[in-house]
Amino acid sequence: MTDLPVDEPDRDDGADQPDAGADPATPRGVEAIRAALRTMPSSPGVYRMIDGKGDVLYVGKARNLKRRVINYTQPHRLPVRIQRMIAATLTMEVLTTHTEAEALLLESNLIKKLKPRYNILLRDDKSFPYIEITSDHAFPRIVKFRGTLRKGGEYFGPFASAGAVTSTLTALQKTFLLRTCADNVFASRSRPCLLFQIKRCAAPCVDRVAEADYKALVEEARAFLSGSSKALQHDLAKRMDEAAQALDYEQAAIFRDRIKALTNVQSHQDINLPTLGEADVIACHQAGGQTCVQVFFFRGGRNNGNRSFFPAHAGDEGLPEVLEAFLGQFYAGFPPPREILLLTDIPHHDLVEQALCLRAGHRVRLVVPRRGSRRKLIDHALANAREALGRRLAESSAQRTLLEGTAVAFGLDGPLQRVEIYDNSHISGTHAVGGMVVAGPEGFMKAAYRKFNIRSPDITPGDDYAMMREVMIRRFARARKEDPDRDRGQWPDLVLIDGGLGQLNAVREALAEIGVEDVPLVGVAKGPDRDAGRERFFVPGRPPFMLRHNDPVLYFIQRLRDEAHRFAIGSHRTRRSKAIGVSPLDSVPGIGASRKKALLHHFGSAKAVSQAGLTDLEAVEGISAALAKKLYDHFHSEG
C-alpha cells in the first residue's frame, strides 16, 4: 500500500550513511530523510512524512523500515508526485510493529484517521447498515442498526444502503412477524398495535403468540438471513399443504403469504448466487484522471446491494495499487467477509490476505476469478464502475461550467474550488442552529458540512442578524487558527448568505471584527412573495441585480440555497427532538443509560418511575437499595 514502484526492491546501498558535509544541492526533504535514517530501525513498522506545519504528508508501511525509507533518498527514481512530497518533508516519525501484517493494519488505520494528502484516500467513510436481532429480551426484536458492531450482538449484513435494509426488514416482518418496537414500548402495551392489524407482527407484547412459537419464528428469520432460504421455503410449502389437507385454510393462507413475501424479497435482488455464501465483489475502472471502485455485498448467497467509491489521489496509480490501498481502508471500518472477489490481483496479495485475517478473526481469501459465475459477477461490477464513473465525469464537467459561470456573474477571478452557503433555522428563536453547506467541482462536499448550535445568551430570540454574526465569527476564527496560510483548503472562494442587504452587512461587520475582509460575500434575497426565480443579489460595491430567469447559474444558486435550507432545518429538528426527548431520569445522579433502560423496561415510562414506591424501585435489576432511596427522594423531595 505504498506509492513506491512495486517492481523496485528495497535497497541497502549505504544511503543511510550521510556524508559528513551535506551537499548544498541536495533537496531539504532528502536531508531530513537521511537524518531520520541515522536512528531508524530495521524492523517492521509504519513511517510518516511530516511537513513544516506538522501536517502528515504520507503514511507508509514496510517489512524493514530502514530499507524502505532509503528509496526516498534518490527522488529522481520516483514519480513526480512523490518528488513533490519529498521536497515538502521536514521530519519523519516511525512506529514499529511485530509483523508486517500488523504494520499494514496500522497503516490503514492511520491513513483513515489522518487523511494524508499524498496517500490514496477512501473519501466515503460512512458506516454501513446492518440488520440486528436483539438478544437481551425473551421476545427478540429485529431492527436496522448502524454504527460500531457490539460484542455479543447478532448482526446480518452489511447492506449497501438504508433502502436495501428497509426493504429486507419489511419482507422479514411480513414473513416472520417479528416485533420492531423498543423494549419500553413493548412493556407498556395493553393491546396490539397497527403492525399486528396489517399482519406484520405476532403481538408478543399482549401474549398473542407463545414464547416457544415466537422463538421458532426468530430461528426461521436467522436461517433466512444466513442463506437457508430454499430450505425454509420448502418447509413453509410443506406446512401449507398439511394445513390445507387438514382443511385449516386460514393457517394455509398465512403460510402462503409468508412464502410470497420471501419470494418477493429475492425477486427484487438483481443477482443472487446461492453458492457464493459470504463475499464481497470488487472491481474498479479509471478514466479522465479519476477512479471508481464498485463493491457488491453478498451474504447468504443474496445480493445486499452495491456502492460506488471514488478514491482521492488515485489518478497516478494503476488499478492493482488502487485496489490494494482501497482494501486496507475499506475494511478498517468493519470485518471483511470470508471471500473477496477482485478484478485483478494486487502487489502484496499474501500480506493483505494475512492482515485481513487478523482483522476478521477468521480466514479471508482474496480471489481473482477467471471464468464461470464468479467472473460474471466481476464483469457486472466492472460495468457498474464504468457507468458510475461516466456519470461522475459528466456531472463534474457540468459542475465546473456552473462554477465558472458563478465566478463571472459575481465578478470573481479564477475558478471556484470551494463555495460555502449559510442559513439559520429556529422556531421563535428556540433551538437555533446555523448551517454551512459546501460545494466544489465535484458537487456537494458533505464531509465539510458544519452545523453551529447558537450558544450566546445575549442574542434576542429570533434575531437572525445576531445569529449569523455568531456563526461567521466562530467559523472564520477557527479557519484563521487552523489554516492561517490558507493552503489547507479550509477557506472559501465565495460565501453565499441566505438574506438581503441587512444580513450581508451583519456578516461583513462580523468578519471585520476578526480581521477577515477579503472573503468574497454575496447576499441572496428571495423575490417578492418569496418567488423562486426572482432573487436579488447583493455584492459589496455593486448595486443589487438579478440574473436572467433562464440562467443556469440562477438554478445552481437556488439548488445551493435549498440544500443549505434543508441542512439547517434538519439540524434544528435534531436539536429540538433531543431537547424534547430529555427524560426526568437524566437528572438523577447515578442513573446512566443502562439503569435508565432497566427502569423504563420495568415500569414502562418515566412517569411511572416517578410514582413508584421504594420497594418497587428496589425490585428493578441493577438498582441497589441506596440508589432506590436516592431515586425515590429525588421525585418525592417536596412531598
Swiss-Prot record:
GO terms for molecular function: DNA binding; excinuclease ABC activity. Transmembrane segments: none annotated. InterPro entries: GIY-YIG_endonuc, GIY-YIG_endonuc_sf, GIY-YIG_UvrC_Cho, Hlx-hairpin-Hlx_DNA-bd_motif, RuvA_2-like, UVR_dom, UVR_dom_sf, UvrABC_protein_C. Residues 17-27 have a biased composition (Low complexity). Keywords: Cytoplasm, DNA damage, DNA excision, DNA repair, Excision nuclease, SOS response. Its main location: cytoplasm. Residues 1-28 are annotated as: Disordered. Residues 1-16 have a biased composition (Acidic residues). One of its GO terms (cellular component) is excinuclease repair complex. Residues 230-265 form the UVR domain. Residues 42-120 form the GIY-YIG domain. NCBIfam families: PRK00558.1-5 (NF001824), uvrC (TIGR00194). Interacts with UvrB in an incision complex. The UvrABC repair system catalyzes the recognition and processing of DNA lesions. UvrC both incises the 5' and 3' sides of the lesion. The N-terminal half is responsible for the 3' incision and the C-terminal half is responsible for the 5' incision. Belongs to the UvrC family. HAMAP family: UvrC (MF_00203). This is UvrABC system protein C. The lineage of its organism: Bacteria, Pseudomonadati, Pseudomonadota, Alphaproteobacteria, Rhodospirillales. The gene is uvrC.
